[in-house]
Structure formats: structure tokens, C-alpha cells
Swiss-Prot record:
One of its GO terms (cellular component) is cytoplasm. SUPFAM superfamilies: Folate-binding domain, P-loop containing nucleoside triphosphate hydrolases, TrmE connector domain. GTP binds at residues 228-233, 247-253, 272-275. The lineage of its organism: Bacteria, Pseudomonadati, Pseudomonadota, Alphaproteobacteria, Hyphomicrobiales. This is tRNA modification GTPase MnmE. Signal peptide: none annotated. The gene is mnmE.
Amino acid sequence: MTDTIFAPASGFGRAAVAVIRISGPGAASCLTALTGHPPPLPRRLSLRQLRDPGTGEVLDRALVVWLPGPATFTGEDSAELHLHGGAAVRAAVLRVLGRLPGLAPAEPGAFTRRAFLNGRMDLTAVEGLADLIDAETEAQRRQAMRQLDGALGRLVEAWRDTLLGVLAGAEAALDFSDEGDVDESALSASGLAAAARVRDAILAALAEGRRGERLREGFVVVLAGPPNAGKSTLLNALARREAAIVSPIPGTTRDAIEVRCDLDGLPVLLVDTAGLRDEGADPIEAEGMARSRRRIEEADLVLWLVPPEGGAAAPKGALVVHTKRDLGRDPGGGVDGALAISALTGEGLAMLLDRVAAAAGAALGRGDAVVTRERQRRALEECAAHLGRAIAGAETMPAELVAEDLRLAVRALGAVAGRVGVEEMLDRLFSSFCIGK
């Protein structure tokens, strides 16, 4: 990483201020070239005229910040240019930066990649930063901040340090098995007890289920039922906008319509599906119903809407919702947990939202999960499996195999933090960041 990179760190629309980030060994010379002066005092905003070094033309009067490494986001010498936010100003400065020797435009995620490679962040913190950028609800923000602050990273580092000590003892016992000063029985008692504690802690973290992963993805609520049960009307009422076409003609909804919403700080994905009936459907509607059944199977919660004239039996586990209460008929809401609502008047919607929020909260938690990605889960499961084999085989397996399981357990924890075996994944992860991050 000998080159110096630059990129806008703010949005591209018209704004009061536009920020450009610079990172790398040429950051100081870049400031000197633009301002005609040495870098200002570190970590202070300083007003400077920015000029094109080739022509002397004034580009902008801007606030500049000089951030000498390694105590920076990337771990390198860095600088920021706080420009007036017009598109022409930003474009002119970027054009001049691109002509300076040794400078190159940053790829998406390039600044964060440098922070990771320079040891400023581990991989769990990088993933937390990505989740924070994508967070749409309070619970997602809270979970992302915990990861960014090192909730999982600190645990993994502590577990890894413990296992490295156990492994060192096991390897010493192997290397010096003929020496009398190596207490193999003490290693077996204390070392394997420590390994068991780490394994139990990992299993406890995994016992949370997939709450962290599901919180990132959202709680999927599928609106299902017979045609003309009021699914699209309910979707529009919950979304507070006309997301779906509403028509008295059966079969209007042919494909699933998805709407993301924030429900009590939790991410919820509402899915309006094609109405289900046994006969009279054309081929297109039949395909829509097949897709509806697949979405029902994949849902976290199914709201089974029943119109006043009734309909088919609800799938197992579905929340039955009697619709069109405004027509004045008594659907018997409240029996066996069923609800009665009117999407037109709003009657019963608050109670329905409370039920959905309770189900989402039970499934997702409130951002306190430690494991938030499938990659993390798989590595921790692998570590626990190796530790389980080492502990179970301590008395029966050859010592070399026990030590090998300990080595593989340490390696699996290293993968969680990004120390080993993550090269291919890094490109995918960093490409999901915006330019300038």
C-alpha cells in the first residue's frame, strides 16, 4: 500500500459541505501542493485556499485537516478537505487530485480495508461498520455499534489467548515428553479445563440462535389468505402508502409485493401475496399462488386474513386476522387468539401491530446478540467441534491428534477475527462499502 488514495466521503448531491478524504504516504505533500503551505497543526480545522498546482487557479476556500498516522482511521497519514458543497467545486478538486503524482482514486471500501490491514480494526468490527451503514432501525443500529465497538472481537481474542496457552502447554508436553520437568498430568487437568471453559462460552454464544443474523435481514411477515380478503388494503395501511393495487376483482395481486418498515425499532419486511383458491385460476394467477405458498413456508410470521364470507383453514402457526370489520359483521375475533380489524377505518390495527412487534422482538432480540453473521457462526461452530474432540479424546486419542484439534480450534477463532483464511471473503465485503469509506 505505497500509493495514496482519495475519495469523496460525503454524498454527491448539492449540500452545504462536501468532504474529501486522503490517506497514504503522500497525504502531507498533497496538502502542500494544494495549499502552497506545509500541513497545518494536526487535528485542527484550518482555513486555506486550494489551488490547482499546475495553473495556480483558486479552486475553493476550504477547511483542511491534517491527521498524521498511525493514530488515524486507516493507520496512515491522512487528510480531509471540507469544501463548499457544490457539484462543480467537488468535481474540480477531485480532478486536480487525480493529476497529482502518486495519488489514485479509492475503490469502494478502500479506506476500511487499509484500517483492517494496518490492524486498526478486526474483521468483526469491519462487519459492524458495514452493518451500521446499512442499519435502518434502532435495533439494527444498536447491534452494529456493539460489533463496531468490539463486542465479539474482544470475546474471540480472549478465547484465542486462552487456547494459545493450552496449545503451548500441549506442544511442550509433546516436544519434551522425555524430560522430567514437564508435568503432563497438570497440563491435562488445567489445560483441558480451560479448553472446556472456552468451548462452553462459545456454545453459550451460539445458543442465542440466529437472532443477530435475522436482525440484520429483518423479520418477514407474509400476508396470506383467499382472494379479496383485504391483504393489499392491509399492506397499504401498515405501510402508510399505496404500495399495492387494491381492487374488488379477485386475483389482482399476481406476484409478491414487499415493503420494509420500522416497527418499534425492529426491521420488518411485509409481504403481500397472491390470494389462494382451489379453482378458477388462470396460469399466471396459478404461478402467483405457487409463489405465495413458498413465501408462506419461508415466513417468520404468517397473517392469515379471513374475509367476512370465510375461507380456507389457516396454516399451522399463522395468526388469524378477520378483516373488513367495518362491514358490521361479528367475525368472532379473539377466539383462539384471532384478531378482527378494519384496514379502512383502522379498527384493530394497533392490536395487530402489537402482536407482530411482540413476535418480532422474541425472534430478533434488541441488538444484544454476539453472533451476527453466518460466517462468524460457522467458524465458532468449527472451533467448538474441534474443542469437543480434543476434550473427549484427551485420555484415548494420541497426544498429537489432541494438539492438532487445539491448533484447528485456534485457527477457527483466527478466522472470526480475520487473521486467517478470509482473503476471498474480504473482496466481497469491502466492495459492499461506498466509495470514501
